[in-house]
Amino acid sequence: MTRLWIADVHANLAAFEAVLADAGSADEIIYLGDIVGFGPRPVECTDLLMSLGARAVPGNHDASMLAIRRRSERHPHPRDWDEWTFSQLSRAHLDFLESLPAAVEADFCGVPATVTHHPAGAPYLHPDMPDSVFSEFLGKAARPTLVCGHSHRLIDRSVNGRRYVCIPSIGQPRNGDPRAGYAIERDGEIEFRYVAYDVERTARETAALGLEERFLERWLTFLRTGHDAEWSREYVPGKSVNKWLDGGMARMRPESGSPPAQV
């Protein structure tokens, strides 16, 4: 039995394609959320995920698209990256994201696991956090293993007989390594992998969107290095390890316009 575990593509098609090529065939694919958001190719990445027949859960950026949908906001000239992403997605894409369950059950290395984007009520997690942070939510989990995405770094912690695993990000690493991360499970053994991809292709695609120059310059450095002073913070007790990336940060240039929405 071969099971592919993938997470946090963030509309980075070059990285997604590289991971699928590196992994080869799998009996089952499990996707842990955020297929869209802060990336240049949301349509193609969502199409590719839909074609894989994966068991999938939504991420917070996927949920942002559905929140915009509920507000019936489709701006002819999107003001930020979230609005631009929404303007690209078709009804079929949004229906697909809407259909995803918040959590699914699966086996991870032969042990029953709950699969979701991020543990409910947990802070943004970092591999250097103490056991007490993990035991707080693991003790409430319905199954002995919890497998998630969202933190964009590999985390594999066992506390009091329970295990938390965060699958590393494909499209937006934050660990100082720009390669796309994923995991592959074969006959109950897990292997975490990192694969190089054409970062400059994604950089060119991102630069063409019309983002404000100051944000774009910082974002491309982040993409090329897998590190940013705020978005990749190290763990310091008592301090947040993440500054949230919200759409308001990633503004579009007023003159940039927008390709027509897909129907």
Residue spans of the language-model regions?
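Core catalytic region of metal-dependent phosphoesterases/phosphodiesterases
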Residues: 2-98
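Histidine-centered catalytic micro-motifs
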Residues: 8-9, 115-121, 146-154
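Conserved hydrophobic/aromatic beta-strand scaffold that supports enzyme active sites
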Residues: 103-105, 115, 156, 180-184
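Anionic-ligand binding region
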Residues: 130-165, 170, 180-182
